[in-house]
């Protein structure tokens, strides 16, 4: 239609492409990203809530074999009897505990009649210059511990382990990476000690049950994806209305003069 021909101008075509790209990103990237974070947070909150109301269970019921992992039982309290490997410890660096930097101290624990599992003993604060402070020794005798089951973390890309102050140091608690460093085969999940446990250090608390803003952000991106093409349509309609008003307000074109009018205009009218 001629009245819509202006939409084929470069400016309108560029605007339409921007709106289409923005809408596509809203529905396929931005909204799913926030909704996925909301689903993860809701799942973790549910696991924490369940763990607070459930008594500890033997570790071997959730990790029966050496290659076992239990992502559906994260934060669940478990008990295990066995021995630490005191000469094989690794530090997780650049951890934030109560708003301050900390090291988390990791050590393998051999469960009697069960798997060898990585144990997060807790945290210690770094000395000046991010150096490792003196770390209390582990017990060498058989002990029984109570801890929370945790999922192995993904390794940090581009951040390789290194040795400093006599300790292997890593940037995440990835059981596969720690197993490769120590040469000790570890289960897929690890343990985080609760308070007053043998070999424990600074206690790592349970996260607050906060759903976060992710659901509202996801809904907002969906709304933006809906409103963007509506806005484009509104501006196109407004342009059409403006052109109609401009056309209606312009004076009608002059009618062509007849031969008599031309002669009269040139020689004058007869009296």
From Swiss-Prot:
Main location, first listed in the record: membrane
In which residue ranges is the amino acid composition biased (Basic and acidic residues)? 262-271
Answer yes or no on keyword Cell membrane: yes
Q: Does the keyword Disulfide bond apply?
A: no
Q: How does it sit in the membrane?
A: Multi-pass membrane protein
- One family from Pfam that matches here is SURF1
Q: Which family does it belong to?
A: Belongs to the SURF1 family.
Give GO BP annotations, semicolon-separated: biological process involved in interaction with host
Q: Which residue windows are transmembrane per the record?
A: 11-33, 172-194, 214-236
An annotated GO cellular component of this protein is: plasma membrane
Where does it reside? Answer: Cell membrane
Could you tell me which species this protein originates from? Answer: Mycobacterium tuberculosis (strain ATCC 25618 / H37Rv)
Protein name according to UniProt:
Uncharacterized SURF1-like protein Rv2235
Q: Which UniProt keywords apply?
A: Cell membrane, Membrane, Transmembrane, Transmembrane helix
Region annotation (Disordered) maps to: 245-271
- List cystine links: none
Q: Which domain of life is it from?
A: Bacteria
């Amino acid at each position: 239609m001629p009245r819509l021909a202006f939409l084929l101008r470069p400016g309108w075509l560029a605007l339409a492409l921007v709106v289409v790209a923005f809408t596509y990103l809203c529905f396929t990237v931005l909204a799913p990203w926030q909704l996925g974070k909301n689903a993860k947070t809701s799942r973790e909150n549910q696991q924490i809530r369940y763990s607070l109301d459930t008594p500890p269970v033997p570790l071997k019921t959730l990790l029966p074999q050496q290659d076992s992992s239990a992502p559906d039982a994260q934060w669940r309290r478990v008990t295990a009897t066995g021995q630490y490997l005191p000469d094989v410890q690794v530090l997780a660096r650049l951890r934030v505990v109560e708003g301050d930097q900390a090291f988390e101290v990791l050590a393998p624990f051999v469960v009697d009649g069960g798997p060898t599992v990585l144990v997060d003993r807790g945290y210690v604060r770094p000395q000046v210059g991010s150096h490792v402070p003196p770390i209390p020794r582990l017990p060498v005798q058989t002990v029984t511990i109570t801890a929370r089951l945790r999922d192995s973390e993904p390794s940090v890309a581009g951040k390789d382990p290194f040795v400093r102050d006599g300790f292997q140091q890593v940037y995440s608690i990835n059981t596969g990476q720690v197993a490769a460093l120590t040469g000790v085969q570890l289960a897929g999940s690890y343990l985080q000690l609760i308070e007053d446990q043998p070999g424990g250090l600074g206690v790592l608390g349970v996260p607050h049950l906060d759903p976060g803003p992710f659901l509202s952000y996801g809904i907002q991106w969906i709304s933006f994806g809906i409103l963007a093409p509506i806005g484009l349509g509104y501006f196109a309609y407004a342009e059409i209305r403006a052109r109609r008003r401009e056309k209606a307000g312009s004076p009608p074109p002059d009618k062509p003069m007849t031969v008599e009018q031309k002669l009269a205009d040139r020689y004058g009218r007869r009296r």
